[in-house]
Amino acid sequence: MDFWTAFQAIILGVVEGLTEFLPISSTGHQIIVADLIGFGGERAMAFNIIIQLAAILAVVWEFRRKILDVVFGLKSQPAARRFTANLLLAFMPAVVLGVLFADLIHEYLFNPITVATALVIGGVIMLWAERRTHSVAVDHVDDMRWSHALKIGFVQCLAMIPGTSRSGSTIIGGLLFGLSRKAATEFSFFLAMPTMVGAAVYSGYKYRDLFQPSDLPVFAIGFVTSFIFAMIAVRGLLKFIANHSYAAFAWYRIAFGLLILATWQFGWVDWSTAHG
């Protein structure tokens, strides 16, 4: 492994860790950054699975007490059973639609132009959602109804379009459906666990032949980097939302998306030939 390859692994690990749980689209950033630094091909597909697992492991570690409380409370606590049922219900739409359409979406939509467009549209929707007046019916994730979970699960499917953002769609969906900002954010984190693990297992099995022993050092660097920065992002976001709205992320999405579209429109970067 040469220095440049190690540097690429660090950069992409940082990008994955920082963006996976922020409402700015980790997939979109990965596609754009990977294209800029020339990290692609079969190794990149396997590498992305590894760094996504690292990011979700950071969330599991951060919420380990809540997870253990739910696991040990399944037999005796109705709240734990309801929370688990809500997670499974919210997870199912992504399973069905992911299996049916994942290959088509990857083939036709995994490119920087789609990402940039989705970033802008998602940013505008995020601003609208934050500025509208909405009542809070659910203050805590344990108080969610099955209907809340199912609706958030369907909204999560929008994130199959790169640039939309899984966390962004579920958080904003939660706000629109009556969840508090804290409840919507926490449920988004918890929903990420089965969703991302399921996607990683599916992709890992599908592309199992791409994992080569010679790539272990690159994978290790990306894994550790992604884990560390995902932990920073999760803790930072939970503190941020206590006193702030998501407007800053919305403006970032719009500005970043417009920048990508401008570089393409004026011919500074030929994004149209790029593919994730």
From Swiss-Prot:
Keywords, comma-separated and alphabetical: Antibiotic resistance, Cell inner membrane, Cell membrane, Cell shape, Cell wall biogenesis/degradation, Hydrolase, Membrane, Peptidoglycan synthesis, Transmembrane, Transmembrane helix
Catalytic EC class: hydrolase
Compartments, as annotated in UniProt: Cell inner membrane
Positions of disulphide bridges: none
Protein biosynthesis in keyword set: no
Topology in membrane: Multi-pass membrane protein
Transmembrane region(s): 43-63, 85-105, 109-129, 183-203, 214-234, 249-269
Annotated GO MF terms: undecaprenyl-diphosphatase activity
Catalysed reactions, as listed in the record: di-trans,octa-cis-undecaprenyl diphosphate + H2O = di-trans,octa-cis-undecaprenyl phosphate + phosphate + H(+)
Biological process terms in GO annotation: cell wall organization; peptidoglycan biosynthetic process; regulation of cell shape; response to antibiotic
GO cellular component: plasma membrane
InterPro entries in UniProt: UppP (IPR003824)
EC number: 3.6.1.27
Additional information: Bacitracin is thought to be involved in the inhibition of peptidoglycan synthesis by sequestering undecaprenyl diphosphate, thereby reducing the pool of lipid carrier available.
Role, per record: Catalyzes the dephosphorylation of undecaprenyl diphosphate (UPP). Confers resistance to bacitracin.
HAMAP family xrefs: Undec_diphosphatase
Family membership: Belongs to the UppP family.
Protein's recorded name: Undecaprenyl-diphosphatase
Species, as recorded: Pseudomonas putida (strain W619)
Lineage: Bacteria, Pseudomonadati, Pseudomonadota, Gammaproteobacteria, Pseudomonadales
